[in-house]
A protein has these predicted regions:
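A penicillin-recognizing enzyme superfamily signal
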Residues: 3, 57-251, 255-256
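Pro/Thr/Ser/Gly-rich low-complexity, intrinsically disordered linker/stalk tracts
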Residues: 253-311, 315-316, 323
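Short strand-edge motifs at loop-to-beta-strand transitions and within beta-strands
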Residues: 354-356
């Protein structure tokens, strides 16, 4: 999810919607989006809405308010244009009431924010930073259909809508860049990317305050997991550093099982030897092939995990794992040593068999 949100990947977004729909139904997703002030859905809420497939779309004010709810720990406040009115004649004061609605748990809000802070650090919102302040960021574009590209005589690479949203614990800023009509002109990913970041940097550096951090709720815990485990497992002491990632979880939902993919091998057992006067033949009981490099196990592993969702990916993940193992681990083999009279070990050779023959002459 972290990489998908930072890089604005569409497929994971739809996959997430599909899985949540299976659990709670599409209506609950619609209710959640509506509670954030995003409600241009018409009569039906369909998966395409998860990628911004609206009839007319939303606007920067609504998007700013929606993202502010994440920065506010899950509390949504409908936008308003003034805080108070003071009547000149009577000096009577009217203070605009602030209606706060909890639309998500503070744990959910913080975990999404933590991901988007990483996006901000990576420059999604723009090339700027505020001293001592966390800045969360989310960018995005929309594309056009082949028929629209032909009708308006614009390239298929045209991206009519460019979005850039950033928020801190204190403020939320949303920016839209584009043309109201394709007949007025068009942008592409290349021509829209830098301007939207530059405009945001110019605005944000004049608004955001220094020294403001998002506070992690007590209901959020961190755990170091091993990438490529399905379902998710904790990293072991042998997990390579490039396959470790420290992620956030709602307390009680963090993984508890430690991955056994990377581990020490068992020792061979029942070693025997024979000597015929010139050669020594030693043999032993071969160790079992660990599941992590057993093709039969891995095929069953991926087919089983992806049986409920996206079975078409099982073969791809399986082949990726086989390729990784071939490049980084290899096959089971045995290094054979001779111990001399002084106790030193001398390497005799390597074998993938469970026996080795050595000439003693």
């Amino acid at each position: 999810m972290r990489r998908a949100l930072i890089n604005s990947r569409n497929v994971p977004a739809i996959q997430a919607i599909q899985q949540v729909v299976d659990e709670v139904g599409m209506d609950q997703i619609k209710e959640f989006a509506t509670s954030l002030g995003i409600d241009d859905y018409g009569t039906d809420f369909v998966e395409a809405k998860g990628l911004g497939g609206f009839t007319y779309g939303t606007d920067p004010l609504a998007m700013s308010a929606a993202y502010a709810a994440f920065g506010r720990g899950g509390i949504y406040i409908e936008p308003y244009t003034f805080t108070r009115i003071v009547y000149i004649e009577t000096e009577e004061e009217y203070v605009h009431p602030i209606e706060q609605t909890r639309v998500m748990s503070e744990e959910t809000a913080y975990m999404i924010t933590d991901i988007l802070v990483d996006a901000g650090v990576s420059g999604v919102g723009g090339n700027f930073s505020i001293q001592g302040t966390d800045i969360a960021a989310k960018g995005g574009t929309s594309t056009i259909s082949a028929s629209d590209a032909e009708a308006y005589d614009v390239p298929r690479s045209a991206t009519p809508n460019h979005w850039n949203i950033t928020y801190s614990p204190d403020y939320s800023i949303a920016l839209w860049l584009g043309h109201d009509k394709l007949t007025d002109g068009y942008l592409t990913s290349g021509t829209g990317y830098n301007p939207r970041r530059q405009i945001m940097a110019a605005v944000a550096t004049r608004i955001y305050e220094t020294g403001s951090r998002f506070e992690q709720p007590s209901g959020v815990v961190s755990a170091t997991i091993e990438l490529g485990t399905y379902p998710l497992q904790l990293a072991s002491e042998y997990t390579p550093s490039n396959l470790k990632s420290t992620e956030l979880f709602k307390a009680g939902y963090e993984p508890t099982e430690v991955s056994s993919r990377f581990d020490t091998l068992a020792d061979p057992t029942n070693g025997t030897s024979t000597y015929d006067g010139s050669t020594i033949r030693i043999s032993w009981d071969a160790i079992e092939i660990p599941d992590a490099i057993n093709p039969d196990y891995l095929e069953e592993y991926f087919n089983g995990y992806f049986s409920d969702y996206y079975a078409e990916y099982a073969e791809e993940y399986y082949q990726d794992r086989i390729a990784y193992n071939d490049a980084n681990i290899g096959t089971i083999g045995y290094q054979v040593y001779l111990q001399d009279a002084s106790g030193n070990l001398v390497s005799l050779g390597y074998t993938t068999n469970n026996y080795y023959t050595y000439s003693a002459s």
